[in-house]
Amino acid sequence: MTLEQIKEIYSRPLTELILQALEIHNKNFGNDIELCSLKSIKTGTCPEDCKYCPQSGHYNTSIEKHKLLDKDSILAEAKNAKDAGSKRFCMGAAWKHIPKKDFDQVAEIITEVKNLGLETCVTLGSINAEEATKLKEAGLDYYNHNLDTSREFYPEIITTRKFEERIETIRNVANADINVCCGGILGMGESLDDRFNLLLELLQLPAAPKSIPINTLIPVKGTPLGDKYTDAQIDSFELVRFIATTRILFPQARLRLSAGRENMSLETQTLCFLAGINSIFYGNKLLTENNATINSDNFLLAKLGLESNVELC
C-alpha cells in the first residue's frame, strides 16, 4: 500500500466509500459494539511534553493527580467489572517509562486480574524487550501505545520522545506475543497528508494492531493545543472519511471511537458506525476528561439496534 493508494481510497465519493467500508465490516464482524471503560491507575506529573495532554508535568492544568493506586483498590474495581459482565480490564498510567520500583507491583496486579478470569490490557509508556516478556509472563493480553500522528508532524506535538521509540515499543510488544493496540489523534492542526501517513505507519507496524483507537483532540486549557484551539480541527465528513478508509485498510481490527466523542452529534456518531467503528469508550469519564454519557450511549445504541459487547478497558 502506498500513500497515493490511501489518498485514492479516501477521495472516493462519500457514499461509495462508506458502502465499501460497511461491506468489509459486515464480512468480518457482526452487529456488536464493544463497550470499553478506561481506568487511570496513575494520573498526572508525566515527564512527557505532549502538547494535547493535561497529564503532562510541563503544563498547569486542573486535573487531580495521584500516584499508582494500591493493588487492593485496583482489584476491587476489576472484580466489580467482572460482576457487571466485563471480559477485559485495562489500566492506564501517565509514565514515559514504567519506574523500576513500580514494575513488579504492576506485573502482580496484571496476574491477579488475569486470575479473576478477565483479559488484561495496560498502557504504561515505553517498555523494552525484557519488560514486554515479563508482562506477557504476568498474563498481559493487550498493550496500548499510540503513534499519535504522522512521523512528519510528530515533532510539532512531542519533543521528549522520538517517533522511532514508539515503533520500538510496539516491536517489543509484538515480539513478546502481546496484542497491539495502536492509533492516533486527529484535529491537532495536522494536514490531510499527515493523516494518510499515520495510516501508512500503522500498516507498516511490526505487527498489525488488533484494535485502533481513533481520537479527536479535546482542547484542555493549560495545554499548548488547548490554549490554541477551542475545538478539534477536523469536521465530521473528514472524520467519517478517515474511519471508512481505516476500515478498508484494516478489515479485521477493532476501530474504537475514543476521545472527543462527547462533542459529536448522534448523527455524526451514527455515520462513524456505518463507516466501520465497532468499539467505543463507555462511561461518563475518559481518564481525566468527560466522555459521552451512559444514558446518551444507551439511547443511541437502542435507536440503531446495535448489540453491546461490554468490556472494561
Curated annotation (Swiss-Prot):
Q: In which pathway does it act?
A: Cofactor biosynthesis; biotin biosynthesis; biotin from 7,8-diaminononanoate: step 2/2
On assembly, the entry states: Homodimer.
Annotated membrane-spanning segments are none
Q: Which CDD domains match?
A: Radical_SAM
Keywords, ordered alphabetically:
2Fe-2S, 4Fe-4S, Biotin biosynthesis, Iron, Iron-sulfur, Metal-binding, S-adenosyl-L-methionine, Transferase
Identify the enzyme class.
Answer: transferase
Listed binding positions for [2Fe-2S] cluster are 90, 121, 181, 256
Full protein name: Biotin synthase
Could you provide one GO biological process annotation from this protein's UniProt record? biotin biosynthetic process
User: What catalytic activity does the UniProt entry give for this protein?
Assistant: (4R,5S)-dethiobiotin + (sulfur carrier)-SH + 2 reduced [2Fe-2S]-[ferredoxin] + 2 S-adenosyl-L-methionine = (sulfur carrier)-H + biotin + 2 5'-deoxyadenosine + 2 L-methionine + 2 oxidized [2Fe-2S]-[ferredoxin]
CC cofactor note: Binds 1 [4Fe-4S] cluster. The cluster is coordinated with 3 cysteines and an exchangeable S-adenosyl-L-methionine.
Can you tell which superkingdom this protein's organism belongs to?
Bacteria
Q: Which residues form a coiled coil?
A: none
Keyword Ribonucleoprotein listed? The answer is no
Domain named Radical SAM core: residues: 28-258
Keyword flag Iron-sulfur? yes
Pfam families per the UniProt record, alphabetical: BATS, Radical_SAM
Organism encoding this protein: Francisella philomiragia subsp. philomiragia (strain ATCC 25017 / CCUG 19701 / FSC 153 / O#319-036)
**Molecular function (GO) terms listed?**
2 iron, 2 sulfur cluster binding; 4 iron, 4 sulfur cluster binding; biotin synthase activity; iron ion binding
What are the EC numbers? 2.8.1.6
